[in-house]
Amino acid sequence: MRSESVSKKTLDLNKVRSIIFDDIDVLLEDFGLEYEQVADNIFMRCPIHEGSDNPQGVSISLTKNAWRCWTRGCHDEFGTDIFSFVRGVLYSKDEPYQFSDALRHVCKLY
């Protein structure tokens, strides 16, 4: 009996993450977010919780590849990596918000 090798496609999440952070403007503009970049940090109102009026309520660190909501701690619910940020924004728009949904959304953009 002959053994057949199965070709599997794998997705390197670190590579996807790197692509996102190399051109994060694409993602932020897709969500219609207003933001300000100061050095290696991006600041904006939190797009996840309602009533966010603090223009520096969320920071995204381009060197740490992580985000944080300083107003209500939304990162505690969703996680701090960029895929979690996407999940949170999708959730706030009443869209599906599983990891696979976030990954699919990002892959369509890049």
Where are these predicted regions, by residue range?
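N-terminal structured subdomain of primase-like DNA metabolism proteins
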Residues: M1-Y110
